[in-house]
Design a protein with these regions (language model features):
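Glycine/serine-rich anion-binding loops at beta->alpha junctions
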Residues: 7, 97-120, 271-286
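C-terminal nucleotide
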Residues: 2-15, 20, 28, 36-88, ...
Length: 325
């Protein structure tokens, strides 16, 4: 049986979430938590889908005439997009696993879409990479998930760190994280509707009138400074900008007690920076720390978060890990 295993990274928004909705800039980076997809040849007349992470399985006919239901629909949409590009649809089994918690704002869904697209096209002998991989995976995400921003898919396909503004092509940021510094991601375990938080924050900003506008303008200045800090490897400045950005997100109503507690603990335990990442009201916080402080910090955070992981950022994008025949 021929088969391929491909993986793609998750993402963190380091700066600018929420403000990006009104056309301001954000910085996103790839993380060392990855989604892995194994695609195997089968005999039969089905595409079989299995996600141990989500605990779901389904099978769909090769003519793609019906959906897979729920979370698995994105794979059908990717196959439809590939068929339009001239790829054939052959019987195969798909097994999806992710190191990221689902719906925590870490881009798990886009990473699995990208890894699947790469694995399947590699199985057929014409692997898609770079912009082509991005285009097809994004099409699947778009049909399955409404209006994704494209940040998650871009990071999953290309890796690295990007400066992003809605409606523009993302610009790469050459981030330099010196030895001896690490990031941690802490998941509150609280699920929330991104749409609800986004609508609430927009309402708050509107209510504040000119003051609201100024918060957005300040957030954009923070992004500008953060690009310089990343490129020069100035971790002390980067950390302070993270705390500052969190404060702005608190001001517009995106945080909650669980996130603020994590950020406060990080500050008390000497972390260089911490903030919520993504939509807020739950999901994850990101923390920047010196390597020597990690154990104490992690121990303390684990009492308040469902999951705490030490991660690398600015990692490579989608890649084929195994190809067996």
């Amino acid at each position: 049986v021929g088969g391929v295993v491909a993986s793609a990274p998750g993402k963190l928004i380091l700066f600018g979430e929420h403000f990006v909705v009104k056309g301001y800039r954000a910085i996103a980076t790839s993380i060392s938590l990855r989604a892995r997809v194994r695609v195997e040849d089968t005999s039969g007349s089905w595409v079989e889908l299995h996600s141990p992470t989500l605990g779901v399985r389904s099978r769909i006919p090769l003519d793609l005439s019906r959906s897979a239901g729920g979370e698995l629909d994105v794979y059908v949409e990717i196959l439809r997009a590939l068929r339009k590009e001239g790829f054939s649809i052959v019987p195969h089994r798909v097994v999806v696993e992710s190191e990221m918690p689902v719906a925590a704002g870490l881009g798990s869904s886009a990473a699995t879409s990208v890894a699947y697209t790469l694995a399947y096209t590699t199985l057929l002998g014409s692997p898609l990479y770079g912009e082509n991989l991005l285009r097809v995976s994004f099409e699947g995400e778009r049909v399955a998930h409404g209006r994704p921003s494209g940040i998650d898919t871009t990071i999953a396909a290309l890796g690295g760190t990007i400066l992003y503004r809605r409606g523009e092509k993302p610009a790469p940021v050459s981030a330099r994280i010196p030895e001896g510094y690490v990031f941690l991601v802490a998941d509150t375990g609280l699920k929330r509707s991104t749409r609800d938080v986004v609508d609430y924050v927009l309402r708050v900003a509107e209510m504040m009138g000119e003051a609201g506008e100024q918060v957005y303008a300040v957030a954009d200045k923070v992004v500008e400074k953060a690009v310089k800090a990343l490129e020069s490897g100035d971790m002390e400045l980067l950390g302070n900008l993270m705390y500052f950005n969190h404060g702005l997100l608190v001001a517009v109503g995106a945080s909650n007690l669980a996130l603020d507690t994590i950020v406060d603990i990080a500050r008390m335990r000497g972390a260089l920076g911490a903030k919520l990442t993504g939509a807020g009201w739950g999901g994850c916080a990101v923390i920047l720390a010196r390597r020597g402080d990690v154990e104490v910090l992690r121990g303390e955070l684990e009492r308040h978060a469902r999951m705490v992981k030490v991660i690398n950022v600015n990692v490579p994008g989608a890649t084929v890990e195994k190809h067996f025949v």
